[in-house]
UniProtKB/Swiss-Prot annotation:
This is UPF0313 protein CLK_3381. Residues 598-645 are annotated as: Disordered. Keywords: 4Fe-4S, Iron, Iron-sulfur, Metal-binding, S-adenosyl-L-methionine. Residues 600-609, 632-645 have a biased composition (Basic residues). Belongs to the UPF0313 family. Residues 295-566 form the Radical SAM core domain. It holds the Pfam family Radical_SAM. PROSITE patterns: RADICAL_SAM. It comes from the Bacteria. NCBIfam families: SAM_YgiQ.
Amino acid sequence: MSNMDFLPISKEDLKKRNIDVLDFIVVTGDAYVDHPSFGTAIIGRVLEREGFTVGIIAQPNWNNIEDFKKLGKPKYGFLVNSGNIDSMVNHYTASKKKRHDDFYSPGGKSGYRPDRAVIVYCNKIKEAFKDSPIIIGGIEASLRRFAHYDYWDNSVRRSILEDSSADLLIYGMGEKPIVQVSNLLRYGMKIDSIKNVRGTTYIEKDISSLKDYIEIPSFEEVSTNKKSYAEAYKIQYYEQDSIRGKTLVQKHKERYVVQNPPQPPLSQEEMDEVYALPYARTYHPMYEAEGGIPAIKEVKFSITSHRGCYGSCSFCALTFHQGRVIQNRSQDSILKEANMMTNMKDFKGYIHDVGGPTANFRHRACKVQEKHGTCKNKQCVFPKACKNLIVDHKEYLSLLRKIRKIPNVKKVFIRSGIRFDYLMYDKNDEFFKELCEHHISGQLKVAPEHISDKVLNLMGKPTRNVYDSFVKKYYDINKKIHKNQFLVPYLMSSHPGSDLKAAIELAQYIKKMGYTPEQVQDFYPTPGSLSTTMYYTGINPLTEEKVYVPKDQKEKRMQRALLQFSILDNYDLVKEALIKAHREDLIGNGPDCLIPYNKPYKKSHKKNNVKNNNNHYNKNNNYNKNKDVSKKNKKNSLSKHKKRK
């Protein structure tokens, strides 16, 4: 592929296209990948379809102002995002340790973007072009649109609109708002006059003319009073609906952050149009010498079938970004994309995924949503399935069957996550059977997250007995179809509500599983989630009940160690945790014990004289039998963070 297959990135590209001045320039923290899994590509191609010229400045050197000037000054403004992931999540682990890799950067190396990329980029653009409008969007801007708790600062920060000095913020999926805003700019409207576009947030000095709005506790209140913070979050949480949601206002000193109601969901026709745009479907050739962009490997042969999720897991901020209403593509659109993939020279016959935030949520949760929107204080699948919930996998199954029949397609995997509770609600086992028979490769990844009902309730997840029933059914089906396939559970430590007692309960469950899971991670308090509000305030904002929060680093390390109690390096922490919790009965050689009385010696490999730092012990734990199951799935914590359902 040549540069002409991509949006322009240089003055040479502009010259070849006879462009003197670009209409918009996108500045992004990710490398430039022209694929519909990347927001920069979608927004760029949508604007191109509308007749605008768009250039890309990917991962500029924030210490060099000239990098922000290399495409000149745009006619209408700059569009700024941090990339597909919040830059702080991208840079730091849950324990605040610096990451050394970045799948969205050349060669998978870190260091190509700054911390708090949106703020840094906006400041540099203002320095380069003082009067050029700046519109911010993407996950970092979207989830920080109000005053928010910032885990890395361990304090409440102002709206990112205040800190970045941007002119307008587009939150959520931005296709509709960016088209409306760009057309208003084309018609001659000034950026500071654009105040009525849904899905946007702006700063206002005077709100006397504003109508039908809710004012939430101010920045000054939420930064000093945790009850006020919880109250502000609850109102935000309840109003994220395009039909019933109201305008929200939050005072910041003498100014106001104003969030217009969310944009309406894209129709099926609109979704089809977005995914049919002329993407190059790979990274820009300028990265080839550096080893390419690793993130493309996971998505190049994956298909987005829908957006949105009504699962409402407390630790997921999707409600604030994609929303609870499912927006799906037509089968024809998806089949065209699958057929196109089979003609790509590096296609090997495997489609890696057909799904979305939750693979088996292919349609709206109920008919009520179409007229009245999502329920304000009621969830679709938690704590139990709503009576109006439509439980049906038939359409999704028919889609998968059609893709399987496409010539040159050997296998169609589902990797984006299955909601096992929704699967269990379906009395028709046809989808479950074909899932096991055709769409997994030896193992299915699921996200029970915990097994303590107290913790699960705060997570917004189904009770333990639902997961237990699912596990039994999964193995029963595999036995019937003569397949020896495993489950790989995602598990989380230190979530609000999880004390040592709950962590030990989970460790005992893992003991009965018979192997040590690799897919575990500490709770990560990221912006925008219900769980993050619990973490900061110690309050469940929806019930106003107090919540125990494990914040002490020693206890957090203990909880994580308990989830991998059979790893020798965790022995001391596990023993200390068991003694602290008065569970010495779990120390010893009995069948229910987690660890032996005495710490075993590490075995060393005499051949190369290197110690094996991942030794396992405890003959009563049948880990070795299934060790390959977890070993195959060892991934960096960033990808685990993305894939939880």
